[in-house]
């Protein structure tokens, strides 16, 4: 059954809400808790003088004294109020106070009241009976039949605890014994019963929970959802605070149609660096449509991200993600990847950095999710060297880049290769108040040692290939300020830029194999996506295996408007085009060369016409195809961090996709509209709704609706979603055959006075197409 979610209907419900209060939720919650009055005293409380006030006193010096009628005792931060107090003293060290009837006790950390108590004035301990307590300056209250308090620990018998405000019994924890560790800011409870609205719903022989800002180990709140593909799913995360600099979360999840999944995540910050190690594992996926004829039904994900700086100038970076199969991110939601990425990256880089040079060794591999006969190359090792010297030539800046790389492919049809590259550059910059002129010369010198693929059907290769290509570039930029205001109140500048690049032609068809042109040319080159800023790039292709000839002039300019009072930029508009004095090509094939004398027109603009409104637009017109090739625009209203509305449109022509991907299974234009609303309706209620629709297919891509309800001590999130998913095995897979996964879920969160967020930011991160901001003016 197809489910539709109306963003408009959700937004209209906001009209029925009024502002809950002027103060935010945190301020409202803290209004309901007591705060310490007066100046907080530091030091040993037992050594401070004792002040006693009472209506009546019977003193039997030096042994005891009895005080009655509005008795008040103060020592340091501690205050005690009672109907009757008897103080006994045995020498200078032992002083005890016994309270009869009702009492109130308070210090800088806790307030308590009840009947009958005893307090040792020389050791900061107190014995309380039938007490009710409330933490000072933060949420947290409870009761106990008896309690023993000292300077760093509270031991409570038959106790209860809740972070809810007075008169709110949404949830509570009861136990036979509770120990509150004051310095460590956590509580332990034995034979714990968790209650919701007074009804017991969960039992644990032992439980820990925070009573401060420090993180503590223990069970986190479970969440569940239902999916048309997975069935019912239940997750129970466990948090392990291993040390101040490392922790872990272990989350077992049960899918009614798939089985059990275990997801550990370990985070660390040590002298050896900081990072995260995570995994997701299902021993046997029971879903019938997944590999029905394959006994290997394991599904897993491995992720490691690491950053390290050590010794002097050394850095290590690791980003490794591997999944069991191409469909993994289509079947499972994971924060370590998405099906829209198209691939998972496995890479590392070890580098040594100095002010005028750096040296690094790295490796990279891509795990693609598309069905490709030949995948991308893996690179190991890749050694890069960069050297900078602005004194080698008078008036010139010298730069040298050198690289050695080894390429291998999983396909036996594909060649292997070593690539040796040297790239010296000499730049002569001239600049004054009128603008800048850069004259640059560069030389690309590359040598390949190629090995034919091991398959008999592999193409023959030139074993040794040497390519030397010189380059000359002249770049002129200036900033012109208008004498008169075109629009009142706004100053205007125009920034023209002209660039000339020359590179001679070199046939590079003998570098690599043409079998993998669906993903790259040669070993690691691909046609770069074009926009206004890319017009001024030196090259059309990434990597080093394809360097097209160039005899071209690129001209463009940016018009900017600034508020004359604040100097803040409010509008810009850029337009540019490349003019080919001769065709740009990489080999003798006509499809790999330019046939027109000019490139696409590229336009880009940003407009912040109000502090709450942003608009962005980009447009490209392909003069070769005589059609619009790319276009996108978005409009956003954002009055605050937790309130925004964004409308967007994206377009890519079929011919442009064919030109860049070469294996375009989509077969038609991409025309996609989207709308995202994230809104804090009140301090307690927030929602997020999003919808993306493909106009060309006339079908939805993804729809989401999520509502968050927040209180001082708990929050709940309810969401529904419908998104495109991978084609089930054995099902038709044409352009009109789309398959969806429908989800419904509920998440709860207990709040112990440390989190008051509306949940809008978190909700916006959900989904196959996450919310992004692409505005050039903030």
Swiss-Prot record:
Residues making up the signal peptide according to the UniProt record: 1-23
Signal found in the keyword field: yes
Pfam families for the chain: LptD, LptD_N
BP terms from Gene Ontology: Gram-negative-bacterium-type cell outer membrane assembly; lipopolysaccharide transport
InterPro entries, per database record: LipoPS_assembly_LptD, LptD, LptD_C, OstA-like_N
UniProt keywords, alphabetically: Cell outer membrane, Membrane, Signal
NCBIfam families the UniProt entry points to: PRK03761.1
Assembly: Component of the lipopolysaccharide transport and assembly complex. Interacts with LptE and LptA.
Annotated function: Together with LptE, is involved in the assembly of lipopolysaccharide (LPS) at the surface of the outer membrane.
Family note: Belongs to the LptD family.
The protein, known as: LPS-assembly protein LptD
């Amino acid at each position: 059954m197809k489910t539709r979610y109306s963003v408009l209907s959700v937004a209209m419900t906001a009209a029925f809400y009024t502002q809950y209060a002027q103060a935010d939720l945190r301020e409202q919650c803290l209004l309901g808790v007591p705060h310490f009055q007066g100046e907080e005293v530091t030091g040993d409380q037992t050594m401070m003088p004792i002040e006693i006030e009472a209506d009546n006193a019977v003193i039997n010096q030096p042994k005891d004294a009895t005080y009655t009628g509005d008795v008040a005792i103060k020592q340091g931060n501690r205050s005690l109020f009672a109907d009757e107090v008897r103080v006994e003293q045995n020498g200078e060290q032992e002083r005890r106070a016994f309270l009869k009837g009702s009492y109130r006790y308070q210090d800088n950390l806790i307030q308590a009241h009840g009947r009958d108590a005893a307090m040792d004035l020389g050791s900061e301990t107190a014995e309380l009976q039938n007490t009710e307590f409330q933490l000072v300056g933060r949420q947290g209250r409870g009761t106990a039949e008896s309690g023993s308090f000292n300077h760093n620990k509270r031991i409570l018998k038959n106790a209860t605890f809740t972070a809810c405000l007075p008169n709110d019994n949404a949830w509570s924890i009861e136990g036979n014994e509770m120990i509150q560790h004051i310095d460590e800011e956590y509580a332990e409870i034995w034979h714990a019963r968790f209650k919701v609205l007074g009804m017991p719903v969960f039992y644990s022989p032992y439980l820990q929970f925070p009573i401060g800002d420090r993180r503590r180990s223990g069970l986190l709140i479970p969440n569940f959802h239902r999916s048309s593909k997975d069935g019912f799913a239940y997750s129970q995360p466990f948090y392990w605070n291993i040390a101040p600099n490392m922790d872990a979360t272990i989350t077992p999840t049960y899918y009614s149609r798939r089985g059990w999944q275990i997801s550990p995540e370990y985070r660390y910050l040590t002298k050896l660096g900081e990072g995260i190690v995570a995994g997701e594992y299902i021993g046997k996926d029971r879903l019938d449509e997944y590999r029905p004829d394959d006994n290997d039904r394991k599904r897993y994900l491995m992720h490691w991200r690491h950053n390290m700086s050590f010794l002097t100038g050394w850095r290590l970076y690791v980003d490794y993600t591997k999944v069991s199969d191409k469909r993994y991110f289509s079947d499972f939601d994971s924060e370590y990847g998405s099906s829209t990425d198209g691939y998972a990256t496995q890479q590392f880089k070890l580098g040594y950095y100095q002010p005028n040079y750096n040296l690094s060794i790295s490796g990279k591999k891509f795990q693609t999710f598309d069905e490709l006969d030949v995948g991308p190359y893996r690179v190991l090792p890749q050694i890069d060297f960069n050297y900078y010297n602005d004194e080698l030539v008078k008036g010139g800046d010298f730069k040298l880049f050198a690289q050695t790389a080894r390429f291998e492919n999983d396909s036996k049809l594909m060649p292997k290769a070593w690539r040796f590259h040297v790239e010296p550059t000499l730049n002569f910059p001239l600049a004054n108040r009128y603008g800048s002129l850069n004259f640059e010369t560069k030389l690309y010198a590359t040598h390949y040692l190629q090995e034919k693929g091991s398959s008999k059907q592999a193409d023959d290769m030139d074993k040794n290939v040497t390519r030397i290509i010189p380059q000359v570039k002249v770049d002129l930029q200036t900033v012109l300020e208008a004498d008169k205001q075109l629009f009142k109140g706004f100053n205007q500048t125009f920034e023209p830029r002209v660039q000339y690049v020359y590179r001679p032609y070199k046939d590079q068809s003998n570098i690599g194999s043409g079998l993998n042109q669906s993903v790259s040319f040669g070993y690691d080159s691909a046609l770069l996506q074009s926009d206004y800023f890319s017009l001024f790039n030196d090259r059309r292709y990434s990597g080093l295996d394809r360097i097209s000839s160039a005899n071209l002039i690129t001209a463009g300019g940016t018009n900017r408007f600034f508020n004359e009072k604040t100097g803040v930029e409010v509008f810009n508009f850029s337009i540019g085009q490349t003019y080919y004095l001769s065709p740009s090509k990489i080999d003798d094939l006509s499809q790999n060369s330019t046939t027109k004398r000019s490139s696409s027109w590229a336009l880009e603009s940003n407009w912040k016409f109000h502090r709450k409104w942003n608009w962005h637009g980009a447009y490209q017109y392909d003069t070769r195809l005589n059609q619009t090739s790319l276009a996108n625009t978005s409009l956003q209203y954002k009055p605050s961090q937790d309130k925004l509305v964004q409308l967007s449109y994206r377009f890519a022509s079929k011919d442009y996709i064919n030109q860049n991907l070469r294996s375009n299974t989509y077969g038609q234009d991409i025309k996609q509209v989207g709308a995202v609303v994230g809104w804090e309706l009140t301090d307690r209620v927030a929602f997020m709704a999003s919808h993306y629709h493909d106009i060309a297919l006339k079908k939805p891509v993804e729809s989401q609706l999520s509502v968050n309800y927040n209180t001082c001590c708990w929050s709940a999130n309810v969401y529904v979603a419908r998104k495109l998913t991978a084609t089930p095995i054995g099902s038709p897979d044409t352009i009109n055959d789309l398959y969806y996964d429908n989800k419904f879920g509920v998440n709860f969160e207990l709040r112990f006075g440390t989190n008051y967020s509306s949940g809008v930011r978190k909700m916006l991160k959900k989904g196959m197409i996450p919310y992004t901001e692409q505005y050039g003016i903030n």
